[in-house]
């Protein structure tokens, strides 16, 4: 695995391209995190769109720069809309990202996520329990929470990345980003990131948006993880708890200067 400094150098370079492109990111995400996800993308410089109706989702996925599928509040009708959007993205060669929330805990979403894998996501982002379940190596997880350390799921992530030919992100105290051949580790962040709802889901949206960038997908996705870790650290330094952390986190993303962060670490 390559060191953190390598990722930070990449992250500074990638952030400039991200803000210049402002990827139009079609987010089919869960009801709990819609606003936070949209605000996270906006703060970084992307352009979010929350189009969820089946009639609109299919054509919109074809014109977006990237698509996120997050199954956190999956229903049968929403699954139909998501499948239509993914099929459209696949045909249009729009990169799409899967966030398999609680995939090991509930059979309906497990079958749905496994079915979508045939349509070749550009990236998959999940916690250790979710990646282990999606790879078929284990089932479980406490709802949306992980019962495993990120490193424990790294072999499963690497195997899944090779099988699907995509980037897999396992998040935790240290994030691991792999294409099955190369793996990058991204430490950082702050425990307060786990005390609010939506940081993982928002990261998946940023990962999706980063997949729209030119260049190596592994480096772009690792950069996305680095941005979120750096913003989490910065926000925690000026927060008193979860309530003040959320606006501080959005401000930190908006003002993020990776080059300056590199110089002070």
Curated annotation (Swiss-Prot):
Family to which the UniProt record says this protein belongs: Belongs to the Thz kinase family.
Q: Which GO terms describe its biological process?
A: thiamine biosynthetic process; thiamine diphosphate biosynthetic process
Name-wise, this protein is Hydroxyethylthiazole kinase
Cofactor(s) essential for the protein: Mg(2+)
Instruction: Identify the EC number(s).
Output: 2.7.1.50
Organism from which the protein derives: Salmonella newport (strain SL254)
- Catalytic activity entry: 5-(2-hydroxyethyl)-4-methylthiazole + ATP = 4-methyl-5-(2-phosphooxyethyl)-thiazole + ADP + H(+)
- Superkingdom is Bacteria
Q: Which UniProt keywords apply?
A: ATP-binding, Kinase, Magnesium, Metal-binding, Nucleotide-binding, Thiamine biosynthesis, Transferase
Describe its function: Catalyzes the phosphorylation of the hydroxyl group of 4-methyl-5-beta-hydroxyethylthiazole (THZ).
Q: Give binding positions for ATP.
A: 125, 171
Its UniProt pathway annotation is: Cofactor biosynthesis; thiamine diphosphate biosynthesis; 4-methyl-5-(2-phosphoethyl)-thiazole from 5-(2-hydroxyethyl)-4-methylthiazole: step 1/1
Q: Which GO terms describe its molecular function?
A: ATP binding; hydroxyethylthiazole kinase activity; magnesium ion binding
The residues the record assigns to binding substrate are: 50, 198
